């Protein structure tokens, strides 16, 4: 990518400056074609570890590897001209130590050319976030429901119902915001608490199943397009049913092949005279 191309791209610093302003638009992307389609409409594109479930049929994100994230990060970067691209750090790539997190984050940035990494965790990851940001790695935080912790959290469920959960999310938000993160995702958190946290922290909040008061919103693209039907979270709005349309197109193709309607004359080559 040229220097001019990089300058036209939205930076993490610009995302941070959008706090309290026009809502930040974010969707997931895992491939070059999808990135090209989404780029002009989004401020942020997230190469999420949700790709494990959406693309690879995994039951959770736990099985996603660093190499998988890097491969898909490269693919997305080939299709982007405007949006800021953030790549998830997968489970096991950053929790052990801040030094290991740094080495793996450097790999992601160097090998994909993306703009930032995202990692899950609040107070327990604040030191790691600070370590990375002080060394030139832009970091997006992720608090509330954390998919990489579903096996210890009792599954995918909204959080912030008890005083204990409420207190933890407040502490997590301030810890991540104070550690140098340029933004923080708040997932699956009760609306009043997500609204409160958004007002209390100085960095943009990106909601997913949180609140319209958040500084931005993110959803899984395959969810809003009707391409992933294993389950649909409560917080997802379907904007199309591409899965049904793809199935109908495949059925029409199969019918025409079996009835020898396809290929027709216009789809074949004639010998040159």
From Swiss-Prot:
Gene3D superfamilies: Phosphoenolpyruvate-binding domains. It is found in: Cytoplasm. Belongs to the PanB family. Mg(2+) binds at residues 49, 88, 120. Pfam families: Pantoate_transf. Binds 1 Mg(2+) ion per subunit. It catalyses: 3-methyl-2-oxobutanoate + (6R)-5,10-methylene-5,6,7,8-tetrahydrofolate + H2O = 2-dehydropantoate + (6S)-5,6,7,8-tetrahydrofolate. GO terms for molecular function: 3-methyl-2-oxobutanoate hydroxymethyltransferase activity; magnesium ion binding. NCBIfam families: panB, PRK00311.1. Its cofactor is Mg(2+). Signal peptide: none annotated. InterPro entries: Pantoate_hydroxy_MeTrfase (IPR003700), Pyrv/PenolPyrv_kinase-like_dom (IPR015813), Pyrv_kinase-like_dom_sf (IPR040442). This is 3-methyl-2-oxobutanoate hydroxymethyltransferase. Pathway: Cofactor biosynthesis; (R)-pantothenate biosynthesis; (R)-pantoate from 3-methyl-2-oxobutanoate: step 1/2. Its main location: cytoplasm. 3-methyl-2-oxobutanoate binds at residues 49-50, 88, 118. One of its GO terms (biological process) is pantothenate biosynthetic process.
């Amino acid at each position: 990518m040229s220097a001019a191309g990089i300058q036209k791209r939205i930076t993490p610093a610009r995302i941070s400056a959008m706090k309290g302003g026009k809502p930040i638009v974010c969707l997931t992307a895992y491939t070059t074609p999808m990135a090209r389609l989404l780029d002009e409409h989004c401020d942020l594109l997230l190469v999420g570890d949700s790709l494990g479930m959406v693309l690879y049929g995994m039951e959770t994100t736990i099985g996603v590897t660093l190499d998988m994230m890097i491969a898909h990060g490269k693919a997305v970067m080939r299709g982007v001209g405007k949006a800021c691209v953030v790549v998830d750090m997968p489970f096991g790539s950053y929790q052990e130590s801040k030094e290991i997190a740094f080495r793996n984050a450097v790999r992601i940035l160097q090998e994909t050319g993306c703009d930032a990494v995202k990692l899950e965790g609040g107070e327990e990851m604040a030191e790691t976030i600070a370590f990375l940001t002080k060394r030139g790695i832009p970091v997006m935080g992720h608090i509330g429901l954390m998919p990489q912790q579903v096996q210890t959290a009792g599954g995918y469920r909204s959080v912030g119902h008890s005083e204990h959960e409420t207190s933890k999310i407040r502490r997590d938000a301030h810890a991540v915001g104070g550690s140098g993160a340029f933004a923080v995702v708040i997932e699956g958190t009760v609306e009043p608490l997500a609204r409160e946290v958004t007002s209390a922290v100085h960095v943009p909040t990106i909601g997913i199943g949180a609140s319209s008061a958040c500084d931005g919103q993110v959803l899984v693209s395959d969810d809003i397009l009707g391409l992933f039907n294993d389950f649909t979270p409560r917080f997802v709005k379907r904007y199309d049913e591409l899965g049904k349309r793809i199935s109908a197109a495949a059925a029409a193709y199969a019918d025409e092949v079996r009835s020898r309607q396809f290929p027709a004359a216009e789809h074949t080559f004639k010998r040159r005279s």
